[in-house]
Amino acid sequence: MSCFYLDLLKIKDPSFMKQLDIQELEALAADIRAFLITSTSKSGGHIGPNLGVVELTIALHYTFNSPNDKFIWDVGHQSYVHKILTGRASQFDTLRQHGGLDGFPKRKESIHDVFETGHSSTSLSAAVGMVIARDIKKEDFYVIPIIGDGALTGGMAFEALNHIGDMGKDMIVILNDNDMSIAPNVGALHNVLGKLRTSNTFQQTKTNIDKLMRKIPTAGEKLADTAEKAKDGIKHLLVEGTFFEELGFMYLGPIDGHNLEDVITNLEIAKRTKGPVLLHIITKKGKGYQPAELDSRGTWHGTGPYKVETGSFIKPAKTVASWSSVISNELMRLAANDERIVAITPAMPVGSKLEKFAKTFPERFFDVGIAEQHATTMAAGLATQAMKPFLAIYSTFLQRAYDQLVHDVCRQKLNVVIGIDRAGLVGADGETHQGIFDISFLNSIPNMIITMPKDEEEARQLMDTAFAYDDGPFAIRYPRGNGPGKELSESSKLIPIGEWETIIQPVDAVILTFGPTLEQALKAAEQLEDLGQRVGVINARFIKPLDEALLHRIFKQKIPILTVEESLLKGGFGASVLEFMEENNYTDVTIHRIGLPDEFIGHGSVPLILESYGISPTGIVLKINEMLAQSE
């Protein structure tokens, strides 16, 4: 470890770097790595991506002048070094905690965070907008999007590349190529980049030819200029064409992204170049920390706390399986008996626990990369051929495929089973990753069934019901983390479409809820019983369609009704119950909703966030007592 003279906690902005020589910059890099490893070992975070961009980030801030020059960090989880160099090292003990330092770029956090990210493949389009605004306003600054090879597989990135090349405006795109995104990359572009990584022969040959020609007296310069086409021919012979030059970029690289001097030199070349430039740098995810460097699965992409000395994770004893594992295990069981079942994931095989499925049924498993729109319509295509596709996708990423859900899946009433992972609050990743919008946007689509199980047994039953259903798409939501630990019975059963479960018969009032908030409702009902209130609890496992027969019986009791959901109130489950009440003219019933407000929910622990919005036994008890008092 280095002993750099500058205390990282005292950095206020990147201007100090301009006075450092290359050895001092390298010492700074070593200190930043040590700081990141120590800090994230306590808090957790995206350690792998950040260790890989230490030299790149230092070189960017050394070469350019932030915030006048604009850095846009695609996905944004690799912005920790940027945060350190822009004066936020002292806040790292609050990283991803409620009210603390955000794990992604945040405009309100620093003037150096010019664009907020969290989902992938957005940086290039944002950069196009900034470049156009700059030129219209006749301003002078550089726009530098930094995008990874994984994010570059997203369709939005290709759309932007096409536009950038066509515009021909000044822009410097940094391709941070570490041969991984969260999991190992897939797809044809990955193969193209692989060829470019090994094309040093071409780069050296091109440079040497140019130098030799320009040494020829008198005619040398002209000969070098007219030889460009010949050199392009050599390029095609050696690397079968460079994708980015065909799009209109000047391509620089590939270069070693951990060689500070080389990175700075190439950034200076890019600054002096007119038109769009793509600088292709090769980095090692997890650089400088052996457990992260050796990671081939994506385990060290983002972690909880860990022991620095051993690289072992500090986790509470795991006694039950995760929700993702429960769903994946049932998918495996079903697929073993039905060759029509196919699994699709957009770059999340590890998080969705589909690795075992991929090994067992390789011909029926498809990781399509960061391509949610393609994954969804691909599932629709499979369904037209009597296959049974299972689309495993995080709630926050399902947003990206809304049109495909509407136009390709639901409109055609195709039998696609959608496993909506990380549904509800996810905690530390904050605004960009909370899975709180899917109910609202799926509720508006005809032919869509939306469900959420209360425990592992019901998850299994809903999976079996979904694959037996043959009248359109069927979504199963499940949260991040572990289930409640319900043991599975020897055999499963199908649940009638739209049928809820009465767990406690309502007398004085009733709570309608589903998924993990059911446990909180039961605790609240127990507390209310101690107070002499007989409050029913209904497991509304079908969010759409509603159990209208049961709702009619409840409304006719004329007792207070409380809906509880870990999702947005606008367009949510409670809103659907209110619509039912209005449509059926139940005007003499008191009904209230507990859920998340019309705002983006920041990072922090899930229990703390839930408590702050009253989605807890305490909040439920208070609301029920308030409603009962009003109805007297």
Curated annotation (Swiss-Prot):
Pathway: Metabolic intermediate biosynthesis; 1-deoxy-D-xylulose 5-phosphate biosynthesis; 1-deoxy-D-xylulose 5-phosphate from D-glyceraldehyde 3-phosphate and pyruvate: step 1/1. Transmembrane segments: none annotated. GO terms for molecular function: 1-deoxy-D-xylulose-5-phosphate synthase activity; magnesium ion binding; thiamine pyrophosphate binding. Binds 1 Mg(2+) ion per subunit. Binds 1 thiamine pyrophosphate per subunit. Coiled coil: none annotated. SUPFAM superfamilies: Thiamin diphosphate-binding fold (THDP-binding), TK C-terminal domain-like. Mg(2+) binds at D149, N178. It catalyses: D-glyceraldehyde 3-phosphate + pyruvate + H(+) = 1-deoxy-D-xylulose 5-phosphate + CO2. It holds the Pfam family Transket_pyr. InterPro entries: Dxylulose-5-P_synthase (IPR005477), THDP-binding (IPR029061), Transketo_C/PFOR_II (IPR009014), Transketolase-like_Pyr-bd (IPR005475), Transketolase_BS (IPR020826), Transketolase_C (IPR033248), Transketolase_CS (IPR049557). Disulfide bonds: none annotated. Its cofactor is Mg(2+); thiamine diphosphate. One of its GO terms (biological process) is isopentenyl diphosphate biosynthetic process, methylerythritol 4-phosphate pathway. The keyword Transferase applies. Keywords: Isoprene biosynthesis, Magnesium, Metal-binding, Thiamine biosynthesis, Thiamine pyrophosphate, Transferase. Thiamine diphosphate binds at H77, G118, H119, S120, G150, A151, N178, Y289, E372. Belongs to the transketolase family. DXPS subfamily. Catalyzes the acyloin condensation reaction between C atoms 2 and 3 of pyruvate and glyceraldehyde 3-phosphate to yield 1-deoxy-D-xylulose-5-phosphate (DXP). Homodimer. NCBIfam families: dxs, PRK05444.2-2. This is 1-deoxy-D-xylulose-5-phosphate synthase. The lineage of its organism: Bacteria, Bacillati, Bacillota, Bacilli, Bacillales. The gene is dxs.
